[in-house]
Amino acid sequence: MEEMGYWMGDLLEELGCEKNQEVCQELLKKCGGRCAERNALPGMGGLKEELSGVDSMEEMARIISRHTGAECVPEKDGFLLTYNREKGCDCSIVKAGYVHSPVFCSCTQGFHQKVWSTILERPVTVELVETFLRGGSCCSQKIIFTIS
């Protein structure tokens, strides 16, 4: 499997160069969305059901924290989701040492976009605030959407 690590590193290094930055980010976001479909969303039906009909950002944050274990801070236009403080990246590909490039965090962005747009049944925008691969001590994203 060491070869896989080198291969992934080479691929991300090439995709991460200036001329391919947008293409790489979009590709990684799509991969993250597919990962969410396979690995996260099947177990999140209870969260989706409990959030259904909730229109208070504060109540949404409490429910999300209870279900995910993440810090969830309500904001005017969404919430700030922070998890794994000082514990390291959740991604099994990163944990296995296959990737070290911060460009890989676009995968996380796509993952959360798929999760929260599906759970909340509305379009969301995900902004990466802090990540381990970018030198942070946690993984934090701002999930932006409008409450109908």
Give the ranges of each region predicted by the language model:
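N-terminal accessory segment detector
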Residues: 1-103, 124-126, 136, 146-148
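Active-site helix/loop of acyl-thioester processing domains in fatty-acid/polyketide metabolism
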Residues: 102-121
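Beta-rich nucleic-acid/ligand-interaction surfaces
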Residues: 130-142
